[in-house]
């Protein structure tokens, strides 16, 4: 919605748009699990409808592999009944397009049922601190998602200049905060982008020029973005981040695999 430059010319999203993300999952399954029997859980709102639409587009001619779709309301106390219906349908792939609270419920309940499908988790719910730990890290092993951020604590980034700047900033301005919280990395990255935009504005800080500069970002690299992922915008493109990479949870941290993927 926030990337719709025609309807909302003064608004701009930031993270990858949800239809693009779920299209990536659909393509991944079509290519790697062409004979999969798929069950999908998503919210009964605009976000959920975008998720299932993108997913079906990504599956392409494999869309018939979806055997069951279940939805939930944000006010539902549990999603146990939906998960039981999905499991009993005989699927071997579970596309879990839920928000964080319900994602934790789904991960935990799936383990309690002794069910081990190929489990695709929407990137909105990939936080180790707020989703996977409450669900039980042992229950989250082998989850598959996509991500565009470096993960604090991953040894791969111990000597990374961008990660070092991020850690130094938090130690100075937010001492004691949990650096594993991906929401903090997202906020830092958003602020870093805003600083860049304001610097591009120079002395012209009118609304029109701020928007003009926000629409003129070219291959901007941010401290906590994965290598190869860059921010780009234009007057007709209000989606700053349009790249991601597949990840699998090893029981401790997310491990990236495969190339950088373009979202469309």
Which stretches of residues belong to each language-model region?
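Extracytoplasmic ligand/sensor domains, especially the bilobed periplasmic-binding protein
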Residues: 1-70, 119-145
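Sec-exported extracytoplasmic/periplasmic mature domains
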Residues: 30-35, 56-64, 84-91, 108-115, ...
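Extracellular/periplasmic periplasmic-binding protein-like sensory domains
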Residues: 8, 110-186, 260-262
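Periplasmic-binding protein-like
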Residues: 38-42, 90-100, 106, 117-123, ...
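Solvent-exposed loop/turn segments at secondary-structure junctions
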Residues: 1-3, 18-19, 44-48, 72-77, ...
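Segments of small-molecule ligand-sensing domains
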Residues: 172-185, 195-254
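Structural motif
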Residues: 21-24, 71-85
């Amino acid at each position: 919605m926030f990337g719709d430059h025609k309807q909302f010319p003064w608004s701009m999203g930031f993270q990858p748009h949800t239809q693009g993300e779920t299209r990536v999952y659909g393509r991944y399954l079509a290519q790697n699990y062409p004979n999969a029997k798929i069950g999908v859980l998503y919210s009964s709102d605009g976000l959920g409808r975008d998720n299932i639409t993108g997913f079906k587009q990504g599956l392409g001619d494999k869309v018939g592999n979806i055997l069951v779709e279940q939805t939930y309301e944000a006010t539902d106390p549990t999603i146990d009944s939906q998960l039981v219906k999905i499991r009993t349908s005989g699927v071997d792939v579970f596309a879990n397009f839920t928000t964080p609270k319900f994602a934790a419920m789904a991960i935990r309940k799936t383990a309690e049922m002794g069910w081990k499908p190929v489990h695709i988790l929407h990137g909105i719910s990939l936080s180790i601190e707020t989703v996977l730990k409450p669900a039980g890290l042992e229950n989250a092993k082998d989850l598959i998602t996509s991500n565009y951020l470096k993960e604090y604590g991953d040894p791969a980034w111990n000597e990374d200049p961008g990660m070092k700047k991020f850690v130094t900033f938090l130690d100075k301005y937010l001492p004691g905060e949990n650096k594993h919280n991906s929401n903090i990395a997202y906020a830092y990255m958003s602020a870093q982008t805003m600083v860049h935009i304001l610097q591009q504005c120079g002395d012209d800080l009118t609304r029109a020029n701020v928007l003009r500069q926000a629409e003129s970002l070219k291959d901007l690299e941010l401290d906590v973005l994965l290598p190869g992922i860059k921010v780009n915008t234009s007057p007709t493109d209000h989606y700053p981040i349009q790249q991601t990479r597949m990840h699998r949870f090893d029981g401790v941290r997310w491990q990236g695999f495969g190339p950088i993927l373009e979202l469309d």
